[in-house]
From Swiss-Prot:
Organism: Rhodospirillum rubrum (strain ATCC 11170 / ATH 1.1.1 / DSM 467 / LMG 4362 / NCIMB 8255 / S1)
UniProt name for this protein: Sec-independent protein translocase protein TatA
Transmembrane segments: 1-21
Encoding gene, per UniProt annotation: tatA
Biased composition (Basic and acidic residues): 56-65
Top-level taxon of origin: Bacteria
InterPro entries cross-referenced by the UniProt entry: TatA/B/E, TatA/E
Length: 96
């Protein structure tokens, strides 16, 4: 036997009414509803903030200042030297 019987639900309802009283249940439900509304509002605010930051990044503006483009450091170019020829050895010894 599970909680599918109507008698189980009636007994649970009576116990809840005895524990909390008839006046406390509507206040409890009102507090739950306020909590749900605050949660939804917070989620909507987060989505708006995220959308605003994404659109600011697309425009290249963050906090009202233009974004700076950062380039990778460039290595100084060294002038190209012509390839060196191997030294010429002359024999000072007489031939012949």
């Amino acid at each position: 036997m599970g909680f599918s019987s109507i008698w189980h639900w009636i007994i649970v309802l009576v116990v809840v009414l005895l524990l909390f009283g008839a006046g406390k249940i509507p206040r409890l439900m009102g507090d739950v509803a306020k909590g749900v509304k605050a949660f939804k509002k917070g989620m909507a605010d987060d989505e708006d903030d995220e959308a605003a930051s994404v659109s600011a990044e697309r425009r290249g503006i963050e906090d009202g200042k233009p974004a700076q483009t950062i380039y990778p450091p460039q290595q100084p170019q060294q002038p190209q030297q012509p390839p060196q020829q191997p030294p010429v050895h002359r024999d000072d010894a007489p031939r012949g």
